[in-house]
Curated annotation (Swiss-Prot):
The gene is gmhB. GO terms for cellular component: cytoplasm. Mg(2+) binds at residues 15, 17, 136. Transmembrane segments: none annotated. The record marks 59, 110 as: Stabilizes the phosphoryl group. One of its GO terms (biological process) is carbohydrate metabolic process. It comes from Mycobacterium tuberculosis (strain ATCC 25618 / H37Rv). This is D-glycero-alpha-D-manno-heptose-1,7-bisphosphate 7-phosphatase. Substrate binds at residues 15-17, 23-28, 59-62, 109-110. Pathway: Nucleotide-sugar biosynthesis; GDP-D-glycero-alpha-D-manno-heptose biosynthesis; GDP-D-glycero-alpha-D-manno-heptose from D-glycero-alpha-D-manno-heptose 7-phosphate: step 2/3. It is found in: Cytoplasm.
């Protein structure tokens, strides 16, 4: 999918809702009580951490822009997520959040590449050519395309059963299945 380059680091950019946790139908995950891990997601993050020097969550949280929750509410959710993962030795390197409503014309709302380009700009050892966007929606796959257009390359992985119409570089039913495939590609057994 992508090739190694000496001196540069892989970066895995993950969508949150629908990839790591269940989406709340017709609403937003407004607090930690509403956050529900998808099966195998925490285990997948641990497996992926062994391979990816950087794991960054990139998420649109338009509930903030709509006034349904605050930026602090989102930070608290991410702090709890980070603490649960840390208890198992897993670190998320960053949370890139667009708090704007879709009606606003910001540069950070996916599929615009602002959040990813911001991360890459602040981490010069991370390499767009070695970056992968993992998401469950067309906007995530378009994000990978837009990062590639701006930075030279970026692969896309779709999570979930819906067809991407051939837009994704690879598709898996879950984050866990993606992690297992990465492990197999790296020669891991089991």
């Amino acid at each position: 999918m992508v090739a190694e380059r000496a001196g540069h680091q892989w970066c895995l950019f993950l969508d949150r809702d629908g990839v790591i946790n269940r989406q709340v139908v017709g609403d937003y995950v407004r607090n930690w009580r509403q956050f529900e891990w998808l099966p195998g997601a925490a285990r997948a993050l641990k497996k992926l951490r062994a391979w990816a020097p950087y794991i960054v969550v990139v998420t649109n949280q338009q509930g903030v822009g709509a006034g349904l929750m605050s930026a602090v509410d989102v930070m608290v959710i991410h702090r709890h997520l980070q603490m649960q993962l840390a208890s198992d030795g897993v670190l998320i390197d960053g949370f890139q959040v667009c708090p704007h409503h879709r009606s606003q014309r910001c540069g950070c709302r996916k599929p615009r590449p602002g959040l990813v380009l911001d991360w890459l700009g602040r981490h010069p050892d991370s390499e767009p050519l070695l970056s992968i966007v993992v998401g469950d929606s067309l906007s995530d796959l378009e994000l990978a395309h837009n990062v590639a257009a701006a930075a030279g390359a970026c692969a896309s992985v779709q999570i979930g059963g819906a067809s991407s119409g051939g837009v994704a570089d690879a598709s898996f039913d879950s984050l866990w299945e993606f992690a297992v495939a990465v492990g197999h590609a790296r020669g891991e057994r089991g």
